[in-house]
Amino acid sequence: MGRLLAFVVGAALVSSAWGGCVEVDSETEAVYGMTFKILCISCKRRSETTAETFTEWTFRQKGTEEFVKILRYENEVLQLEEDERFEGRVVWNGSRGTKDLQDLSIFITNVTYNHSGDYQCHVYRLLSFENYEHNTSVVKKIHLEVVDKANRDMASIVSEIMMYVLIVVLTIWLVAEMVYCYKKIAAATEAAAQENASEYLAITSESKENCTGVQVAE
């Protein structure tokens, strides 16, 4: 739950606006046979600066030493390298409709154990200013483990516990408020009844006095 919440919030912040770009770390545990998103977000320091960006992804399988290129994405074109481990499994899930890429994430479908290892998301950006251009590059590193089934991390467990604690606290608070309001209404009703009774007795007493005065006068 904690992971899902973090992912949903991060995705909303990133997709809402370029100026609201937020760099969020990728998840690092994929489930065998499932689809997994490897997150790579690289924000510009100044959102108003014009830029063109492309990316190259490299991969080092667990137990090997060298990184190999698996894809390049530039000008809205995805170029996949010939690699049977990723053939028909890689889907672009980053920015679209712009050359100014800030979300450079990918999906890996039908994950296998061969996808365990280290990934590098190389981000190359050309910044255009009024009188000059400037090239920048950054590398985002992600270590991925493939497991048989999803494991609940401590953050997820703590988040769920906190959710139930919050529900209990809110329930107790609501009951206390209802009891307080009930007592307050009951006290007000009782006070009003006593006041009405006092007024009735006062009127009755006054009427008797008036009647007695009339009889004496006669």
From Swiss-Prot:
It is a single-pass type I membrane protein. It holds the Pfam family V-set. It is found in: Cell membrane; Perikaryon; Cell projection; Cell projection, Axon. Residues 19-157 are extracellular. It comes from the Eukaryota. Belongs to the sodium channel auxiliary subunit SCN1B (TC 8.A.17) family. Glycans are attached at N93, N110, N114, N135. Residues 180-218 are cytoplasmic. GO terms for cellular component: axon; perikaryon; plasma membrane; voltage-gated sodium channel complex. Gene3D superfamilies: Immunoglobulins. Residues 1-18 form the signal peptide. The chain crosses the membrane at residues 158-179. Regulatory subunit of multiple voltage-gated sodium (Nav) channels directly mediating the depolarization of excitable membranes. Navs, also called VGSCs (voltage-gated sodium channels) or VDSCs (voltage-dependent sodium channels), operate by switching between closed and open conformations depending on the voltage difference across the membrane. In the open conformation they allow Na(+) ions to selectively pass through the pore, along their electrochemical gradient. The keyword Nuclease does not apply. A voltage-gated sodium (Nav) channel consists of an ion-conducting pore-forming alpha subunit functional on its own that is regulated by one or more beta subunits. Interacts with SCN1A; regulatory subunit of SCN1A/Nav1.1. Interacts with SCN3A; regulatory subunit of SCN3A/Nav1.3. Interacts with SCN4A; regulatory subunit of SCN4A/Nav1.4. Interacts with SCN5A; regulatory subunit of SCN5A/Nav1.5. Interacts with SCN8A; regulatory subunit of SCN8A/Nav1.6. Interacts with SCN9A; regulatory subunit of SCN9A/Nav1.7. Interacts with SCN10A; regulatory subunit of SCN10A/Nav1.8. Interacts with NFASC. The lineage of its organism: Eukaryota, Metazoa, Chordata, Craniata, Vertebrata. The keyword Disulfide bond applies. This is Sodium channel regulatory subunit beta-1. GO terms for molecular function: sodium channel inhibitor activity; sodium channel regulator activity; transmembrane transporter binding. It comes from Oryctolagus cuniculus. InterPro entries: Ig-like_dom_sf, Ig-like_fold, Ig_V-set, Na_channel_b1/b3. Disulfide bonds join C21-C43, C40-C121. GO terms for biological process: cardiac muscle cell action potential involved in contraction; positive regulation of voltage-gated sodium channel activity; regulation of heart rate by cardiac conduction; sodium ion transport.
